Regions:
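Conserved C-terminal structural/oligomerization subdomain of aldehyde/semialdehyde dehydrogenase
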Residues: 1-110
Length: 110
């Protein structure tokens, strides 16, 4: 089918039958996109297990939205960037590695 391989932006619910968890994960991951996956389960252990296996930038479980301070971003062709939270600000930072810096030295104001 095409619908599970496309990145759809809209109120669309796609339900595809499966026999095993492994098959469900394979169907969900068999796409070049990976913005958000949704997991519905009465078993917290199963939901956690599935969330770890899914290839998406964000996973929402049992209708719970992402928390405040969470980033927004995907994987694969859905992009690698992160917006929001500490991960979003890191896009604008330029790290510098300094070897042998002595933090015990008190520097005079210039």
């Amino acid at each position: 089918m095409t619908i599970e391989k496309e990145e759809i932006f809209g109120p669309v619910l796609c339900m595809i039958p499966f026999d095993t968890e492994e098959e469900a994960v394979a169907i969900a991951n068999d796409t070049p996109y990976g913005l958000t996956n949704y997991v519905q389960s009465g078993s917290p252990a199963r939901a956690n297990r599935l969330a770890r296996q899914l290839q998406a930038g964000m996973i929402e479980m049992n209708g719970k939205p992402r928390g405040a301070g969470s980033f927004f971003g995907g994987v694969k062709q859905s992009g690698r960037a992160r917006e929001g939270g500490i991960w979003g600000i890191e896009e604008f930072l330029e790290p510098k590695g300094i070897s042998g810096y002595d933090f015990s030295v008190k520097e005079a104001a210039e």
